[in-house]
Amino acid sequence: MEENKVERPTMKMLPGDEVRQIMWRFAERYDIQMAIAGARQTARSVVARLVANGQRFTHEWTPEKQSLFDAFDASGMTAATLNADCGGLFEGPRNLAMSLVTYETAWVDNGAATSSFVNDLAMGPIAEMGTPEQKTKYMTLCAPGNPSGKTWRGSFALTEPLPYVGVDTGVLCGRVSVAEWKDGEEPMLRVEKRGRFITNIEICDYITIALDSGDERFKGSCMVVVEATDPGKFDRGAQTKKLVHQLSNTGDPVIDVVVPASRIIGGYTVKDGVIVPNLSHSEIIAQVFSKTRVGVGVMGAASLMSAIEPVIRYQRTRFRGALGVNEGSPRHALGLQMKEDVTQRLADVWATAEAASSLGFDISRVYDRIEAIQDEAKEKLGKGRAMLKAMKAPMEKAVQLLAEGKNPEEDEDVTVRYVYLMAIANVLCPSCKLWNTGHGADVMRQAISLMGGYGITEDCPGFLFYKWTDMQLDATYEGPEAVQRRQISETMGNPVFLAQVEAWAKECEACPAADRNGMNALAAALRLWAWTRDFAATAKDAAGKKLGASQRHGVVFPMADALAGLMAAKSFHADVKHLALTGGDHPVVGPELESYLNTFNDLLGTIAGNVAGEAARICAEVVFGFNAADAEKQAEFCALRAKVDVSLAGTKIAKDNAAKCLTTVMIPEALDYPM
C-alpha cells in the first residue's frame, strides 16, 4: 500500500445527530429521536447538576437524588420502558430505543442511567414472560399520570448473598412455600428472600424475585412479583456503601411476605395437588438478561464516547494563559497536540468508543428483529426437546444459505430466520457486555491519563474519573466478565454462527477500502479465530486433556475475549458501510460524506488492527502454549497467522490519520453541561 501523498478531507467536527441517526439506523424513527431529546435534556441538566453539586459524595438516597425520577417521568424516559397500550412511548419492539435512551443518560452519569434502566430490568420478567393481566396491571401502574395517582418504581432480586452473587444465576436461597390453600380458593404463598446489592430497593413499590421451592406442594423455581405493601416483612435493608453509581440506590433487603399465587410470573397450573409454575426462574432470566445486559454495555460505550471532546479541549488549551504562549502560535492553538503521543492514544480511545457503540446498537437491532418473529417461530418449533429437534432443519438451511452467499434473514421460513438471528444474538449480547465494560474500562483509564492530574479531580470536565470508576461496577453488573465469557464459549460453536463468521470475513474483504481501513486484517483474524476454535475443539494437551472442554477456562475464555473484540470491529464496519451507502442523500451529511467516511475508515483501521493483533496473539497461545499441535497443524496455523500479519498493512497509517484529525476537528468552546 502506498502512503497517502494527497491531503484527504477529514471530519470537520465531531459527529452530530444527523450522522448518528444514519449509522445507528433511526433516521426514520421520529419517536426515538424525541425520546433521545428528552433523555439528553434530562441528563445534561438535572443529572449533571446533581453530580456538579456533590450528590455523588454520599451513598445515602437524598431528596435531590429522588428528583431524578420526577425528571425521568417528565422527559418520557419512564414511559419508554412500557408498552404503548399501557402508557408507553413505542409501538412494537423497543430494544434499540431503550439502548439509545440509556446511552444519552450514561453520557453524563452511569448511576443515573442505572436508576432509569433498573425500571426496565424490574419490568423485564413481566414484560417478556408475564401473563396479560400481569403486564397490564404493572405497566399501567408504572406509567406516569396513571389513575392511581402514583408512578410505581420497580426493583429486581435474583441471587443471594455470598459466595454466588452475580455469578451462578442457578443458585437460589430464596424460598416459596404454600402459606394457605383453602378449597376452591387461590393459594396464598409465603415468599422468603434475602437479597444482596439490590438496585432501587430503597424506593421500589414492587420487586420481581427469583425463588426456589421450599414446599412439596410447590414444584421447581419461579419468579414472583412482591409489592411493598404485602402483609409480612418488607425490610429494605441498609444502603450499600458503594464507591460508585451513587446516583442509584442499592441495599440488602430482607423479605418475608404472603402473596397470592397469581403473582407467579407467567402463571401456574395445579397438578395432583401441586402448584406448577408455567415458567422456571431460569427460563425467565435467560429471556430478560439476554436483552438487559446490552443496556449495561451501552453505558460503557457512552462513557468512552463522552470522553473525546473533553480530552481534546484539555489538550489544546493546556498552555493557554502561560507566559510566552501567544494567541495564534502553534502552542496556543494545539497545546499538547503538538506531540503525537497524546493524539495517538486518544485515537485508540475514540476508535474503541465507536466500535463499542456500534456493537451495542447492532445487538439492540437484532433483538428488535427477533421480537418481531419470535412468537410465530416458537409456535412452529415447539418446546423442550421437541424444539431442539425441530431446530435442526432450519439451522442446516441457514448454514447452507450462508455458504451460498445468501442472507437467511430473507428466507420465507420464519424458523430459519429465527435460528439465524438467535445464533448471532447469543454471541453478540455477551460480547457487548464483556468488551464494552471490561475492555472499555481499561481504555477509559487511558482517557483519564490523558487529562493529567486534572483527570483525577472532582471537577474533571466530563466527570471522566467518575465514569471510569462507575465502569468497574458496570463490568460486574448483571453478571461479571466470567458469566459473559462462559456464555460466549458455549454459543460460539453454533454451526450457524460459524458459517456467519466466514460470511463476515468475505464481506470485509469485499469492502472497497479494505486495504486501508483494516478490513483485510479483520477478515484474516476472523478466519484465524475460527480455525483455532475448531482446532481446540478436538486437540488435547500433553496430559490428554481436551483444550476446548467447556470447563477449560484458560482456553475458551481467552477465545471469547478475542471474539468479542472482533465482533465490535465487525459492527463498526457495518455502520460505516451503511453510512457510505445511504448518507449521500442526506442534505446535511451528504456534502461532507467523504470527510466523514475518511475519518471513520481511519478509526475503523485503528480498531481493526488492535483487535486482529490481539486475536492473533490469543490464538497463538492456544495453539502453541499447550504443546497440542503437531507439525502439520502448526504449519496450517502459521500460514493463517501470516495472513493476519500481512493484512495489518496500512492500519497504523489509518491511526496516524485519525490522530491527525484530532488536531483539526472542531469542538464547542465549552461542554454543554455544568462542571
Language-model-detected regions and their locations in the chain:
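Flexible, small-/acidic-enriched active-site or ligand-binding loops
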Residues: 232-266
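Glycine-rich phosphate/cofactor-binding loops in nucleotide/flavin-utilizing enzymes
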Residues: 2-18, 101, 414-419, 443, ...
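N-terminal glycine-rich flavin-associated loop
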Residues: 113-135, 139, 164, 179
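C-terminal helix-coil-helix/basic helical segment that borders enzyme active sites and/or dimer interfaces
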Residues: 51-59, 354-433, 568-609, 613-631
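A short core secondary-structure module
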Residues: 186-236
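Amphipathic, small/basic residue-rich leader segments at the start of a protein or domain
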Residues: 1-117, 137-147, 368-412, 416, ...
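C-terminal amphipathic alpha-helical interaction region
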Residues: 513-675
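A glycine-rich, basic-preceded beta-loop-alpha segment at the flavin cofactor/substrate interface
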Residues: 16, 253-292, 312-337, 497-513, ...
